[in-house]
């Protein structure tokens, strides 16, 4: 498993920086965003360092599939209202032009009454 010693998310996963953990297993880690945009707002990341979605390969299909199945379960556990009246939003920014600020692949999972409309 690869880690970048300069990556803030790798440091959080390793326990060197405190976080409010939501979930962890051998492949995935989830923790609350420190500047939430919604009543429910956590990050879902691979434990190993992948800079962005642009670096994914066929080897990543299994954990990526697990991540997509896990996200709705965690969203509900964290307080998102059930689909279809409720729901949640997943955002994954890729690269500088895509708005990615931390160079460790991650998804923002957000829920609540349209919090992203705040601007």
Feature locations, PLM:
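HIT superfamily nucleotide-processing domains
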Residues: 1-119
């Amino acid at each position: 498993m690869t880690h970048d010693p300069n990556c803030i998310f790798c440091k959080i996963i390793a326990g060197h920086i405190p976080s409010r953990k939501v979930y962890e297993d051998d492949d995935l880690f989830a923790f609350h965003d420190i500047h939430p945009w919604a009543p429910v707002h956590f990050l879902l990341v691979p434990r190993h360092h992948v800079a962005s979605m642009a670096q994914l390969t066929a080897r990543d299909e299994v954990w990526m599939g697990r991540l997509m199945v896990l996200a709705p379960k965690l969203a509900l556990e964290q307080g998102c209202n059930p689909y279809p009246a409720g729901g949640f939003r997943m955002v994954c920014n890729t690269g500088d032009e895509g708005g990615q600020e931390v160079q460790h692949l991650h998804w923002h999972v957000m829920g609540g009454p349209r919090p992203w409309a705040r601007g």
